[in-house]
Amino acid sequence: LQEALGANYRQRILPERAALLRARIAVGEWARPLHFEREGITTLTDIAYGEHGDFNKLDIVRPAGPVVPGRPVLLHIHGGAWMIGQKSREALPLIRHLAQRGWVVATINYRLSPAAKWPAHIVDVKRALAWVKAHIAEHGGDPGFIAISGGSAGGHLTSLLALTPNDPAFQPGFEGVDTQVQAAVPFYGKYDFIDRDGLVKGSHGFTEFLA
């Protein structure tokens, strides 16, 4: 490090960052990501946001203690090729870390293929967003600042949600609800279903399966 950064590189590290660098890593927790517990957070499970049973439920993860208004909000969308996955089994380190840092996080289920056909997935995600905007203040969240994230299929739905604000085609029955968000962070999603550049090998039957 001294060769690359100079002999005095330690002096350029901010004191608050230096304290974090000296902290010991709990290797046991990192090795068990599905049980990545955090102190100082509260989880509310299986809150209904729509009419499709367990597929239309969400969990809220927030700082423990009394509700404090005005906290930033994250809506997280799980992955799983639009066919598998659920809200309680993905991105737990991220969700719990943000809650410990003062965020209110809503992590959602949505209808899955092959039983659900396009555009059921994005309709559910938008309906969940509508619920969050209407109710998240009850849990301390600021409905005026909502970020969204998700990986794989969740990354695709994150991008689609961000790019189609207030689109009535994806908001049947709640066309008048504002579905704009303030930030979107998709991870490794699939974005080109028509393969305009000819990069996909093999059949496109998977797309037909979803639709």
Language-model regions: role of each:
Residues 1-211:
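Alpha/beta-hydrolase superfamily serine-hydrolase fold, recognizing
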